[in-house]
């Protein structure tokens, strides 16, 4: 973690820049694609799970869809941020020249197209524990074997055949994207066995 305090590391007209007080964690790009958000999109948040307190979490808006987060944050963003103790009021989207009193810049624990650092497990453990604590006791009973469908996967034209084979083996076929994030966590926590192809659906495991 590069800890930058009382240093100006920018070029430009400081008179026109905004100034942010307090301790700020720079978290990289705010990914709106689900699979990228729960992988490299969370990979700079590990100081939070190490019990370091921050006043704000600063993101760069991704090139596509930044306004959609401001106007209507996706359900999974809200759920995961809440699980990490981050309120939406703490999130800053950097759209203009900005100075910080204290800025923490962690190296990504999961760089894109690379291996994940073990500290990512601490982030996912927080999400898992929050999910379990959010569910009623009767919702934690063991359930079916699940096959996670990839109905929108254009790389396969035999999805119905694959799904039929899993149904014959006693699996319940589900398309997780049809459920709220909390409901997805409930289904996965209930499952005896989960099967599927590599992709966003299995990232939840």
Predicted features and spans:
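The feature primarily captures lumenal catalytic ectodomains
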Residues: 1-204
């Amino acid at each position: 973690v590069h800890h930058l305090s009382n240093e100006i590391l920018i070029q430009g007209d400081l008179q026109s820049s905004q100034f942010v007080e307090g301790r700020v964690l720079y978290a990289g790009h705010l990914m709106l694609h689900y699979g990228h958000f729960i992988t490299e999109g969370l990979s700079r948040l590990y100081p939070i799970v190490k019990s370091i307190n921050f006043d704000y979490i600063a993101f760069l808006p991704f090139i596509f869809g930044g306004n959609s987060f401001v106007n209507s944050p996706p359900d999974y963003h809200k759920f995961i941020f809440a699980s990490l103790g981050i309120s939406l009021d703490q999130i800053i989207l950097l759209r203009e020249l900005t100075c910080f009193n204290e800025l923490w810049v962690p190296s990504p624990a999961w760089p894109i197209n690379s291996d994940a650092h073990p500290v990512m497990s601490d982030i996912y453990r927080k999400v898992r524990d929050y999910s379990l604590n959010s569910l009623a006791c009767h919702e934690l009973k063991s359930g079916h074997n699940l096959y996670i469908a990839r109905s929108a996967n254009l790389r396969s034209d035999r999805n119905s055949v694959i799904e039929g084979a899993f149904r014959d083996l006693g699996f319940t076929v589900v398309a997780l994207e049809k459920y709220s994030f909390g409901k997805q966590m409930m289904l996965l926590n209930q499952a005896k066995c989960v099967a599927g192809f590599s992709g966003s659906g299995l990232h939840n495991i």
